[in-house]
């Protein structure tokens, strides 16, 4: 609790939860785990001082300033492993951030429909062992619409694990100048998914 009236006035009245946050620390930048290039950073007007990454401590300061109580960090899986421009952030890497600040961060397990049973086991591990609270899917990175058959086992496992899955739908951006991804995740395609999985969150 704030100790003074001045401090209290600086705290937003309503605390929020940021449901999709990409880890963008110097570690992810140095390891090529961001998925975008300098052209994208300029396109979205990212301040120059952020191009090298933002420390976890700075994340927390920004969360406090914006009135964000908790953020959901994505252990991203973006594209098949052998595709140019693809990248991923290991589940354990995101779990370490969550363990460091358990009252501020929770993990989301990125999913790759092309990995089959391996992905289902990975999702079990993320939820049951690491304490992740949901799954996350980037359809455009796989050039795969959300109603594709390869996605269905993942949706079924999410229902079994009683976790939500979130995904990026709609118009896609140009993240990398040399890798153009199609806008395959049209929102209407979730209609059939919702019909087939009425209990999917």
Model-derived segments and spans:
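Mid-domain alpha/beta scaffold segments of enzyme catalytic cores
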Residues: 4-150, 157
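Catalytic pocket-lining loop regions of alpha/beta-barrel enzymes
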Residues: 130-134, 144-201
